């Protein structure tokens, strides 16, 4: 699948802490039925075997809806589950190294917090940027919120699709 403004229109990032009584699969399917255009599986607590199992299941689910499925931070899992893409942060594998490992067809997303990080990521093969955080979030409590105007500066500096963290009630 290709990365464009339409596939990134409503980008859902999973958070097991919010599942409540539903399974993560149920929540992802509800999101897909509700119009989500891209799903990122973000798992920080699962071992690789459990992560791969969940990734395989959600990858198949997203494929059945024609929606890109992205793995957060784990290139090996992304390759093994035939994900449509991989998202890496600044402290993870560099975009150029990811591109060399996954080839030209997998979508690569990179977190960026400055114009310089954004431009470097795009120059090294990123298809989209995760920019932010624009607001404080419950999923990333240690992150600094971007200064006013920074999101626009970053978006204006690159030719790539960008997203930022928005709260559901905003």
Label for each model-derived stretch:
Residues 1-85, 90-92, 101-126:
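Conserved N-terminal beta1-alpha1 strand-loop-helix module at the mouth
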Residues 89-163:
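Conserved anion-binding
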Residues 164-170:
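Conserved small/polar residues in nucleotide/adenosyl-binding loops
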């Amino acid at each position: 699948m290709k990365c464009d403004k339409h596939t990134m229109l409503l980008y859902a990032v999973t958070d097991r802490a919010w599942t409540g009584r539903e399974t993560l699969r149920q929540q992802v399917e509800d999101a897909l039925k509700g119009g989500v255009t891209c799903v990122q599986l973000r798992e920080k607590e699962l071992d690789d075997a459990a992560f791969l199992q969940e990734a395989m299941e959600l990858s198949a689910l997203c494929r059945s809806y024609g929606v890109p499925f992205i793995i957060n931070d784990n290139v090996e899992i992304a390759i093994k589950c035939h994900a449509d893409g991989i998202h890496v942060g600044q402290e993870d594998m560099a975009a150029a190294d990811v591109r060399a490992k996954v080839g030209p067809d997998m979508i690569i997303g990179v977190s960026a917090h400055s114009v310089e990080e954004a431009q470097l990521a795009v120059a090294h093969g990123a298809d989209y940027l995760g920019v932010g955080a624009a607001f404080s979030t419950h999923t990333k409590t240690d992150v600094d919120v971007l200064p006013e105007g920074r999101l626009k500066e970053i978006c204006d500096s690159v030719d790539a699709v960008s997203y930022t963290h928005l709260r559901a009630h905003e």
